[in-house]
């Protein structure tokens, strides 16, 4: 994997319906590919009650579809975004600048890292 910056995409800032958030996700992944980016940090929130919001659930389900279809290489949910996670460690090894990411090791359930 080539070294690359991570682009942050806020999918939930204006509290869109789930369908709109998924359209944004699709557009942002397509745009990231055009820009030759390899990493996205998705901000989807985790629900107002802290138990998993509809946008988070839908986004993570869509990402799993993309993995199965070979459209993305992988993803790391925010709660796993730490040096003890195997994929996180691989991404950190190939892109040391990620070690400065403000969410690394914080178990932030409101984000997901996408490896394109």
Named regions from a protein language model:
Residues 1-116:
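Long, charged, low-complexity intrinsically disordered regions
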